[in-house]
A protein has these predicted regions:
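Bacterial N-terminal signal peptides that target proteins for export
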Residues: 1-9
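Bacterial N-terminal signal peptides
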Residues: 10-20, 237
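Sec-dependent signal peptide cleavage junction
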Residues: 19-30, 218-226, 244-247
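Acidic Gly/Asp/Thr-rich repetitive segments characteristic of extracellular carbohydrate-active
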Residues: 27-53
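Extracellular beta-strand-rich solenoid/capping regions of secreted or surface-exposed proteins
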Residues: 44, 57-69, 78-110, 115-128, ...
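Beta-strand-rich solenoid/repeat architectures in extracellular/passenger domains
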Residues: 74-95, 110-117, 132-142, 158-176, ...
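C-terminal low-complexity, Ser/Thr- and acidic/Pro-rich disordered "stalk" regions positioned immediately N-terminal
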Residues: 193-223, 255
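C-terminal membrane-anchoring or membrane-association module
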Residues: 235-255
């Protein structure tokens, strides 16, 4: 009887210990459906993952200033505010409007479309990993700016993996998918673990970014040639040594 009671008490204690952790896990993810809910979730440090429950329209730049994951869940964030002093809806009027800005922190952004701004995403002295499909179409000046604003000492760092797909149907030389402004000290583009240092005023279309991706998947470098030659030399050396030992053994046999 005592053993049975002890068993039940142990089960209850385990359940009580697990309960708070279950509660924390449940509260760390929030689904948002409008601009105000999104801003509120970004201000709540207990929320580690923000999921878009539907497409969201914004009238201001949305700032990410703490570590967080934003899961677009296949939805769109669209800036529908105005540009310039004339309150124009023309996003080719430069007003420094980005649909989303990640400022001096680390964040993960996945499966989202960012459209309607001067730029889709500003990585301002931050480190951002992009996952899934990131659609940057429909922005007036381009997709992603790797910037370093006034007073920001850290450089922008964007991470792409083999699970990242960039989409930009309005990509062009004048509206690149990725760029570094001239007032920056440079930035880092990381693709599948390989890091590339980008210089101020460098701009990259979608095809040029894809060229980086291809080079990391199929590197045609001098290192490969050296490795090939080294391998051939090793094989030749082993064969020569084996031939020498065999010849010596036959010579000793006849002697």
């Amino acid at each position: 009887m005592l053993k049975k009671c002890t068993k039940y008490i142990s089960m209850i204690l385990i359940a009580l210990c697990l309960f708070p952790w279950i509660q924390v896990e449940a509260s760390s993810t929030m689904t948002v459906r409008n601009q105000e809910e999104l801003k509120s979730a970004l201000e709540n440090s207990n929320i580690s993952t923000i999921v878009l429950g539907n497409d969201i329209e914004t009238t201001e730049k949305i700032n990410v200033m703490r570590p967080v994951t934003i899961d677009g869940n296949g939805h769109t964030m669209q800036y529908v505010g105005t540009f310039g002093d004339s309150d124009s809806s023309d996003n080719t009027i430069w007003s420094g409007i980005y649909v989303l800005q990640v400022y001096k922190t680390e964040a993960t952004i996945r499966n989202i479309a960012l459209t309607g701004g001067n730029g889709g995403l500003l990585i301002n002295g931050a480190k951002v990993q992009l996952e899934g499909t990131i659609d940057l179409s429909g922005n007036g000046f381009g997709g992603i700016e790797l910037g370093q604003g006034s007073g920001v000492e850290s450089i922008a760092h964007v991470i792409l993996t083999d699970q990242t797909t960039l989409v930009n149907r309005t990509d062009s030389e004048d509206r690149p998918t990725l760029w570094v402004p001239k007032d920056s000290t440079g930035s880092i583009l990381e693709i599948n673990g390989a890091q590339y240092e980008l210089l101020p005023e460098e701009e990259f279309t979608l095809n040029e970014i894809e060229a980086f991706t291809i080079s990391t998947e199929n590197p045609e470098t001098g290192d490969q040639i050296i490795l090939y030659i080294s391998g051939m030399f090793l094989c030749f050396s082993v064969a020569l040594f084996a031939f020498y030992k065999l010849s010596k053994r036959e010579k000793d046999y006849f002697l």
